[in-house]
């Protein structure tokens, strides 16, 4: 019935209502008419799309067209309006600025964005590149930028700005790199932008003064290019190295360019012969692959000449060969093909597919004895691996885009960042190294060094610097394993801890279960990994602090007992905390540690404690008396006490003058004071001339020292200033059992320290021995006795 109704409807004459809907309900009368209708609709859709694309192209600034063209190849669905907007903002903000070359400043961020587009970076990164100098060099605020372009762009620009604000230089370099690594952890695109920024600056470096060119080139060669290498950005790394080489060694660069150009014809012929043989054999083996030349870069050639001591004529591998396959299994098959053609060189095969270098780079490397007996380097990898090798971490965003298009994650994408063990290692170092200089030293070492791969007994791979030992291995596994390491077995055999490890060895370490187990100081002589060095240094620094803490407590106890003072009452938590705050130490433990390390004397701390308790005058006198070598009880001084007698007047009170501090052996004279006593002076005293004007008051005095006599002595110490100098001199005097009454130190502009000490001693004959002891202190070049007035 329904079918009849439909048929009737189809042939019935149209009503008024149906006529109004006729275009939508009309059924074609034949297949030909159906096809015509479909073609017409398709043409209308294409026309609309063409008009829309033409309109979009017409709104794109012509300056951006090269950037857009490159970016669209990888990101066909990219939102170009935000790129246009970012360019307009950057152009407006930099409108009044020029580069050193005289070009408008906007050419720089545009060039950086183009470099990043060629690397395959995402739209957000290109937007940040266009804006990366606006916050630093214009009045555009980070808040305004974030509000207009989003939080992600804001984070990237902020990261690049913070790196730019600290110059890579001798003082700040370590801290700058530390900030750079921290920024990488937050978002590695910050460093990718920075590397691209440096690449364009290196390309235009000729417009800067020569000294600035050299400084930037050294920074690039030592830090930026190796970092680009570790991030897998090989193409950028090579260009940075060659540009730096041309600036730092222009004549050597030009000579190598000339030598390479001179070998070009024979090199091209040789390469064509090699490629033909490989292609024919691969085809016969039914392996689908592309074979291409791989030119050596000038800096690489120079390094071989310098590091390996070769002449240019001995460097045969000016051109290597790269084989690009579709599948990993084809890579290993291609190695077999190459080895069947030419004899492989022993020890020159590297499998970076199974063990990726730096967690990013994958390839098979082999060197064979090629045609004419010349060494030939061959790299074999998949096309995906090649993209990663060329662009490194930047390729991660290509994979992200691939996922966005088809919903399937590329096998490399999930692990691209997470597998960068080297980056995680850097983050560990930057947290552990308290000193930025120490961190930079570790970083530079690791950037320059080659690596080996060893295995745990469970088959886990541990990457170590070449020359590493079982101790380096232990610290790479875990800090506590390193601290407690007492032995090792390599490939099932016991070995010494300083034995160097080789590629592919299985390493097992034995650890101590003793609670006080720790590293040996001897390990510092043979470990090579930055992690092991840092951990061992930290362990001994902590141990020294603990020893200094106990030493400081013992020194305080001895000083208090020497003064006959109540230890528990004097050295209590509250009073010690007050003194620690007064002396600007964090807590009581820090104060004890400072005492143990000699930064502050126990006697000084005791004096501060006494002052806190309000009894400083009386207690200090008692402390000074009991700390002298004399064992006799204190009593009022008589003529015998000062060691001077007055002929014919045995009961007269005598006193040693403080202006010249005479001691037995000095030529002396007496001066009758208005109180009836006698003041004893050296005859060469600075006051002697004025005293002798009153000749009637000058009398004869003689030395008559007794075992209880105590004399004041002043000495001057001249030394080259250094850390803990005063502490070492004071300790030398204390070892001679003298009681220091006063000390003063001045340091001149040429770092010469002049110290003056006044102390009591019982036997002046001992003075020569004391002066020799002070002369033996490191840095002291003169010490002699002086008068107080001198």
Swiss-Prot record:
GO terms for MF: ATP binding; GTP binding; GTP diphosphokinase activity; kinase activity
Pathway: Purine metabolism; ppGpp biosynthesis; ppGpp from GTP: step 1/2
EC number: 2.7.6.5
GO cellular component term of the entry, any: plasma membrane
Catalysed reactions listed for this entry: GTP + ATP = guanosine 3'-diphosphate 5'-triphosphate + AMP
GO biological process, one term: guanosine tetraphosphate biosynthetic process
Keyword presence, GTP-binding: yes
Class in the EC hierarchy, top level: transferase
ACT domain span: 714-788
Keywords on record: ATP-binding, GTP-binding, Kinase, Nucleotide-binding, Transferase
Superkingdom classification of source: Bacteria
Domain TGS: 450-511
Residue ranges of domain HD in the record: 105-202
SMART domains registered for this protein in UniProt: HDc, RelA_SpoT
SUPFAM superfamilies: ACT-like (SSF55021), HD-domain/PDEase-like (SSF109604), Nucleotidyltransferase (SSF81301), TGS-like (SSF81271)
ATP-binding recorded as keyword: yes
Stretches the record annotates as Disordered: 1-37, 620-644
Function as written in the Swiss-Prot or TrEMBL entry: In eubacteria ppGpp (guanosine 3'-diphosphate 5'-diphosphate) is a mediator of the stringent response that coordinates a variety of cellular activities in response to changes in nutritional abundance. This enzyme catalyzes the formation of pppGpp which is then hydrolyzed to form ppGpp.
Family of this protein: Belongs to the RelA/SpoT family.
NCBIfam families: spoT_relA
Name of the protein: Probable GTP pyrophosphokinase
Gene name per UniProt: relA
């Amino acid at each position: 019935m329904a079918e009849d109704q439909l048929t009737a409807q189809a042939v019935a004459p149209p009503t008024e209502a149906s006529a109004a809907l006729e275009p939508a309900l009309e059924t074609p009368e034949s297949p030909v008419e159906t096809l015509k209708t479909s073609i017409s609709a398709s043409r209308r859709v294409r026309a609309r799309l063409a008009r829309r694309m033409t309109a979009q192209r017409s709104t794109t600034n012509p300056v951006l067209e090269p950037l857009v063209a490159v970016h669209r190849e990888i990101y066909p669905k990219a939102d170009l309006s935000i790129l246009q907007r970012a360019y307009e903002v950057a152009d407006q903000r930099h409108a009044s600025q020029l580069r050193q070359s005289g070009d408008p400043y906007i050419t720089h961020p545009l060039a950086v964005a183009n470099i990043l587009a060629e690397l395959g970076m995402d739209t957000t990164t290109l937007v940040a590149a266009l804006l990366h100098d606006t916050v630093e060099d214009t009045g555009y605020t980070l808040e305004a930028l974030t509000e207009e372009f989003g939080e992600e762009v804001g984070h990237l620009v902020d990261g690049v700005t913070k790196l730019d604000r600290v110059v890579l230089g001798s003082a700040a370099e370590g801290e700058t790199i530390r900030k750079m690594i921290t920024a990488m952890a937050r978002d590695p695109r910050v460093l990718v932008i920075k590397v691209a920024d440096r690449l364009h600056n290196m390309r235009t470096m000729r417009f800067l003064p020569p000294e600035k060119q050299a400084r930037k080139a050294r920074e690039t060669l030592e830090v930026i290019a190796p970092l680009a290498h570790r991030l897998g950005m090989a193409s950028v790394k090579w260009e940075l190295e060659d540009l730096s080489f041309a600036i730092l060694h222009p004549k050597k660069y030009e000579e190598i360019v000339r030598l390479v150009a001179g070998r070009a014809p024979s090199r091209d012929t040789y390469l064509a012969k090699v490629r033909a043989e490989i292609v024919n054999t691969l085809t016969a083996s039914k392996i689908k692959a592309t074979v291409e030349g791989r030119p050596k870069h000038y800096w690489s050639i120079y390094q071989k000449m310098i590091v390996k001591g070769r002449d240019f004529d001995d460097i045969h591998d000016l051109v290597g060969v790269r084989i690009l396959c579709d599948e990993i299994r084809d890579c290993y098959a291609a190695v077999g093909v190459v080895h069947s053609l030419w004899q492989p060189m022993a020890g020159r095969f590297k499998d970076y597919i199974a063990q990726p270098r730096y967690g990013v780079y994958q390839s098979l490397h082999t060197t064979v004895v090629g045609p004419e007996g010349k060494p030939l380097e061959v790299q074999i990898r998949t096309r995906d691996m090649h993209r990663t090798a060329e662009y490194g971490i930047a390729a991660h965003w290509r994979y992200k885009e691939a996922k966005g298009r088809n919903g399937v994650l590329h096998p490399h994408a999930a692990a691209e960042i997470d597998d960068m063990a080297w980056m995680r290692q850097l983050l560990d170092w930057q947290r552990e190294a308290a000193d930025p200089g120490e961190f930079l030293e570790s970083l530079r070492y690791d950037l320059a060094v080659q690596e080996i791969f060893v295995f745990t007994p469970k088959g886990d791979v541990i990457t170590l610097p070449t020359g590493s030992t079982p101790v380096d291995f232990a610290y790479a596994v875990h800090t506590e394993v390193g601290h407690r390491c007492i032995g090792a077995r390599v490939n099932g055999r016991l070995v010494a801890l300083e034995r160097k490890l080789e590629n592919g060895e299985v390493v097992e370490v034995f650890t101590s279960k003793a609670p006080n187990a720790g590293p040996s100081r001897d390990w510092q002589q043979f470990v090579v990994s930055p992690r092991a060095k840092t951990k061992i240094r930290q362990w001994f620094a902590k141990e020294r602090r603990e020893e200094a803490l106990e030493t400081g407590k013992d020194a305080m106890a001895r000083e208090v007992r020497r003064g006959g003072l109540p230890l528990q009452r004097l050295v209590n938590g509250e009073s010690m905390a007050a003194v620690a705050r007064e002396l600007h130490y964090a807590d009581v433990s820090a104060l004890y540690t400072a005492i143990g390390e000699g930064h502050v004397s126990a006697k000084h701390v005791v004096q501060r404690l006494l002052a806190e308790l309000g009894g400083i005058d009386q207690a200090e006198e008692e402390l000074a008396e009991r700390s002298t070598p004399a064992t006799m009880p204190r009593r009022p001084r008589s003529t015998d006490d000062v060691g001077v007698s007055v002929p014919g007047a045995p009961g007269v009170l005598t006193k040693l003058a403080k202006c010249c501090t005479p001691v037995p052996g000095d030529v002396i004279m007496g001066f009758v004071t208005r109180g009836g006593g006698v003041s004893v002076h050296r005859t060469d005293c600075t006051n002697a001339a004025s005293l002798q004007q009153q000749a009637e008051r000058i009398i004869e005095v003689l030395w008559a020292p007794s075992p209880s006599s105590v004399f004041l002595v002043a000495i001057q110490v001249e030394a080259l200033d250094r850390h803990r100098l005063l502490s070492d001199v004071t300790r030398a005097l204390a070892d001679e059992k003298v009681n220091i009454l006063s000390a003063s130190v001045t340091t001149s502009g040429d770092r010469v320290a002049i110290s003056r000490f006044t102390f009591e001693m019982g036997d002046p004959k001992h003075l020569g021995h004391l002066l020799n002891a002070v002369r033996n202190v490191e840095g002291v070049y003169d010490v002699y006795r002086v008068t107080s007035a001198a």
